[in-house]
Amino acid sequence: MDPVIELNDVVAVLGQFPALAGANLQVSRGEIVLLQGPNGAGKTSILRVCAGLLPIERGSGRVLGIDLVTQRDEVRSRVGLLGHSNGLYLDLTVEQNIRFWASMVNATEDEIVRAMSLMRIDGRLSSVKTARLSAGQRRRCALASLIVRRAEIWLLDEPHAGLDAQGRDELDSVLRHAVSAGATIVLASHEMERASALATRVVTVDGGGVQ
């Protein structure tokens, strides 16, 4: 089976600083791959390269068969990245954020309602501007937005952060359901026990490379 993510000797920089130094990674469809490693090892940089947000300086990469060097815009339209900022518009309400992302893929009303239900977003919470939300509520809103986008690949940076115990359990259930529906997931997490139990494979990132 051809990999849906393939990085070959990838070098990337952030400003003047090296972010990745010859990283190699292959991910097959339907996997949940956990990136583990110390802070600054390159986990977030790998996610950003795979999302088409961090350019490759040297080496090569493909996501869903799309070249990461020459077709980054197309990659961005096919994958979903959940980072520390959550990708939310703070001046919009929760529901407006979700409906904005839903409009990008012509998601149905049923899909919108289901995504909000999965992430426990009720009528009261849906009308609140995201600037007023707690960290956990923002994360739930961002995950609902990711669900309605129908992303084929989910790239998750600390997805359990800010969630209570119930929210973490619900997130794990959502991720397993996404994989059963055809998605592939790569995540970085400090919740090692929980994330390891969720993952189908664990890879170690250190010094800007994958071991």
Where are these regions (language model features)?
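ABC ATPase C-loop
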Residues: 146-147
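Helix-to-loop junction immediately C-terminal to a conserved catalytic motif
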Residues: 51
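Conserved ABC ATPase signature
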Residues: 129-133
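Catalytic Walker B motif of ABC-type/P-loop ATPase nucleotide-binding domains
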Residues: 154-158
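The feature captures the beta-strand-to-loop junction immediately N-terminal to the Walker
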Residues: 36-38
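Conserved ABC transporter NBD signature motif
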Residues: 59-67, 75
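Conserved ABC ATPase "signature" region
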Residues: 99, 109-125
